[in-house]
Amino acid sequence: MGGGFTAGVGMARSFQRENVTDKVVFGVMGDSTFFHSGMTGAAEIIYNNARMIPCVLDNRITGMTGHQENPGSGFTLMGEEAPMLNIEKIFETYGFAPVLTVDPQDLTAMKKTVDEAVAALNEGKHPAIVTRRPCLLIKRIKQNLGMCKVNADKCKSCKSCLKVGCPAISMENGKAFIDRTQCVGCTVCAQACPFDAIEKEEK
């Protein structure tokens, strides 16, 4: 854990040494990992002038090991309110700019943010990206996103929705099918469908 940034520094510096400019290195980690072992890696990016883009996937919880709180969640491990450390300000303090924040479930905004970060990198800057969307399993955050369904008449069986990697989506009778017991209504599949065959329905 935490190797997303440090390994990225090594790769980026290797590319720089060989004058490879057509590849961009992205270092990715979650918010919890950033706080416990990623901040030193972020410092290494600046210190070594590594041509890479650090990305923190902030879901406001420690999803990997059991939903423990972290310094960015606003609560201690005992559930008491605590100061909420700001990832963007930490990046800015290290010298990253621009620091871009985006909702990762908005695919258009996400692509625009990545393009903006790459453009800044090509200008010699040190951009950073923070994607922020609370985990749906956080009990204290009530999120009712409804769910999605497939309009079989519009579905062309192109399987673009399967590329999203959502466990709720499969193929049934030659058409895309969404398991209602697993769908959380994020609409990423609907955004990926080129035929508008996936529709949102409110709960």
Name each model-derived stretch.
Residues 57-60, 104, 133-134, 174, ...:
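Short, ordered loop/turn segments at secondary-structure junctions
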Residues 156-177, 188-203:
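Iron-sulfur cluster-binding cysteine motifs and their immediate structural context
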Residues 118-171:
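Glycine/aspartate-rich loop-and-adjacent alpha/beta segment that forms the canonical ThDP
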Residues 150-151, 174-185:
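Flexible gly/pro/ser-rich segments immediately N-terminal to CXXCH heme-c attachment motifs
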Residues 5, 9, 23, 27, ...:
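Feature representing long, continuous alpha-helical segments
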Residues 80-82, 144-150, 177:
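Short, exposed beta-strand "edge-strand" segments with a Pro/Gly-rich flavor and a Y/T-containing core
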Residues 1-128, 140-141:
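Thiamine diphosphate
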Residues 86, 103-106, 151-156, 179:
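Poly-acidic low-complexity segments
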